[in-house]
């Protein structure tokens, strides 16, 4: 980690009040830590948009396991991407519905494509990709 540098920020007083409320709600120790976190989040988002950097994400799926061949199709997708899908958690929500959380690692564009394929399988009730970073390059 590099040397800490102090700098000033000018902003509208209402925006600052809103920011201070956010800091309190999120439990940040101070404005500096909140700003650092915002910058890191923007960096991660940019990396995902560019698509070339290594990233990691979770794909969350909710589906009815009684739908014909759905479980098999999802399993086939997972096996087709066994190098990128590094972990899977399967939860029985009730007698019919399942929750599956997959951890996917790879180039951001590949992770997004895999997530889209899984979420797009007919019979998936809800799916969501949550993208994050491997932590490499963040300070």
Swiss-Prot record:
Keyword Metal-binding part of the UniProt annotation: yes
Alphabetical keyword list: DNA-binding, Metal-binding, Nickel, Transcription, Transcription regulation
Gene Ontology biological process: response to nickel cation
InterPro entries per UniProt: Acetolactate_synth/TF_NikR_C (IPR027271), ACT-like_dom_sf (IPR045865), Arc_rbn_hlx_hlx (IPR013321), CopG (IPR002145), CopG/NikR_regulator (IPR050192), Ni_resp_reg_NikR (IPR022988), Ribbon_hlx_hlx (IPR010985), TF_NikR_Ni-bd_C (IPR014864)
Cofactor note: Binds 1 nickel ion per subunit.
Gene3D superfamilies: ACT-like. Chain A, domain 2 (3.30.70.1150), Met repressor-like (1.10.1220.10)
Tagged with keyword DNA-binding: yes
Residues that coordinate or bind Ni(2+): 79, 90, 92, 98
SUPFAM superfamilies linked to this entry: ACT-like, Ribbon-helix-helix
Cofactor(s) this protein cannot do without: Ni(2+)
A GO molecular-function descriptor: nickel cation binding
Family: Belongs to the transcriptional regulatory CopG/NikR family.
Record function comment: Transcriptional regulator.
Cited PANTHER family: NICKEL-RESPONSIVE REGULATOR
Protein name, entry field: Putative nickel-responsive regulator
């Amino acid at each position: 980690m590099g040397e800490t540098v102090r700098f000033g920020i000018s902003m509208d007083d209402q925006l600052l009040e809103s920011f201070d409320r956010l800091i309190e709600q999120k439990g940040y120790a101070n404005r500096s830590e909140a700003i650092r976190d915002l910058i890191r989040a923007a960096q991660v988002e940019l990396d995902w948009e560019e698509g070339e950097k290594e990233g990691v994400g979770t794909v969350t799926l909710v589906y009815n396991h009684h739908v014909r061949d759905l479980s098999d199709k999802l399993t086939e997708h997972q096996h087709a991407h066994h190098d990128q899908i590094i972990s899977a958690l399967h939860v029985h929500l009730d007698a019919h519905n399942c929750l599956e959380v997959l951890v996917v690692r790879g180039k951001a564009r590949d992770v997004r494509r895999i997530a889209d394929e899984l979420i797009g399988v007919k019979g998936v009730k809800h799916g969501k990709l949550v993208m994050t970073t491997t932590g490499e390059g963040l300070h």
